[in-house]
Amino acid sequence: MVNMFKHIKKSSNNSESWNKKEWQIAEELAVKYLKEKGYKILEKNFKTPYGEIDIIANKKDIIIFVEVKSGKGIRIQPSERVDDKKYLKIVKSAEFYLEFYLKNKNYKISQIDVIEIINGNIKHYENVGWDFT
């Protein structure tokens, strides 16, 4: 298997918790950031039988599935909470979206990104592993 997270370590459970309002603010920051970088937002909080994708965007015929992670980053970075189990849910959800919503569309490639937000600071990890081509 390809190293899925070139910049992200695997982690165990984390006791940090953010309330719903803080989580929504983090996603809004991620959407704003992506729009400023030229991405078109296709979906937010897209639910599938396999899980939820925080943001689905596209840029230059590339479909990007974005997982947003936020927190204080005291003991563990928020992006480190994207472990193999979470990654597999994102992959299955992305496959579902591509199969049922973009079946007849012509997109070149798709990728999974992780956006980490700590105290309003954004780190964007692009193409963290799985390639749909």
Swiss-Prot record:
Lineage: superkingdom: Bacteria
Pfam families for this protein: UPF0102 (PF02021)
Q: Name one GO molecular function term.
A: nucleic acid binding
UniProt record similarity statement: Belongs to the UPF0102 family.
What PANTHER family does the record point to?
A: UPF0102 PROTEIN YRAN
Q: Can you say what this protein is called?
A: UPF0102 protein Fnod_1509
- What does the organism's lineage look like at the top? Bacteria, Thermotogati, Thermotogota, Thermotogae, Thermotogales
